[in-house]
Amino acid sequence: MRPDAVSVWKDTEVRERLSWYRQVMIGRLPAKFMLCRKIPTQVENSDASQEELWNEHASLSQQLCDLVKNVESGSESGWSLKDHHPNLLDLKGALVNRMLEHCNFCEWDCKVNRAEGKIGFCRLDRTTSVGSFFRHYGEEAPLIGVERKGGSGTIFFESCNCHCVFCQNWSISQPKTKMNIIGEAVTPVRLAEIAEELASEGAANINYVGGEPTIDLHTIVNSLTHMSTSIPLIWNSNMYCTMESMRILADLTDLWLPDFKFWRDECAKRLMWVGAKASYPEVVKRNHIFAAEHGSMIIRHLVMPGHIECCTKPILDFISETIGDKVLVNIMSQYYPSNMVPMNPEKYPDIARYPSKKEIQDAYDYARMLGLQFEQVS
């Protein structure tokens, strides 16, 4: 066990800002997806229109929000409530299945019928592929676990809705075609088995990562109906997803672990190949604000060489001005030229090097000046 995985919880700000996640991690409170089973639905999912499903979802989601508040305050016990069938979790499963038929999980909003085998911008049809899964000890200290729980139960999904030219995980995130996807094809049942296996080994959480998990939302949500272990769920995402996806996730996610890479849309378009249909920074800002109202959050910002003034400082300003009192921020210094950058340094001269010590220090100093809580997780 990493020593800081235990000592980090002595920090008052960490305990307060990650309170819900910690209570679920140590088993004092049930995970949100378990609480969804306590909320019954009267709508017959197979016969209802998608509009009717969303209307029912809005009503039940508010009930879940109230229940979470009561459980967290201690005025109600989540453990003693009985499960209902069908329930809010079943409703979410029906909704994501409908969404897959005109896919709008992410802001590319392809609207292709992936359920029938059509391929979206993500290069996926309905099949979900897992590249690997294991207990990860290199994540932020609060994710590693305490009290005999060890490692973050990371599940790496293949493919992505962004095509970052510098991606360090390009081998699984950027298959050239569907035929290049070589991971294990998983059903909801198999994905639940993977999560249960990680939990039985002592994982502190289930960490959905990639690639990008958003594009496999249908498999992930439906897998939760097959899980019996209460364990916190982490949504480790680029956050380039639609509000419909965010509403599905809000009632399931115990800890958000979002990226915020670029402030300027032109930087995102050039270096992430994203934003053609919807502005990357506008989407990500919207989703960060929404997520901060629905669970604990650690924001990741990768310091990019040459982008301190145009991106790093404005992103830190945004966090400080909107959600800085609710979140922790991991200011990451791990960037190195990868993927397409080393082969085309003349095309990407700004990021064809490591960030300098001064650039990293400038980012730290600026965050400190703004009063952001970053040192505990950076």
Task: Show which residues each predicted segment covers.
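N-terminal alpha-helical interaction blocks
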Residues: 1-89, 95-96
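C-type cytochrome heme c attachment motif
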Residues: 104-105, 162-166, 254
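N-terminal [4Fe-4S]-dependent radical SAM core
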Residues: 64-157, 171-174
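A cross-taxonomic marker for long C-terminal extensions/tails that follow the last structured domain
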Residues: 360-378
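Conserved AdoMet/S-adenosylmethionine-binding subsite of the radical SAM
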Residues: 187-349
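Long, charge-rich boundary regions
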Residues: 133-182, 193-209
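Active-site-adjacent loop and "lid" segments of alpha/beta metabolic enzymes
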Residues: 345-361
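Short cysteine/histidine-rich metal-coordination sites, predominantly Zn2+-binding motifs
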Residues: 118-130, 179-193
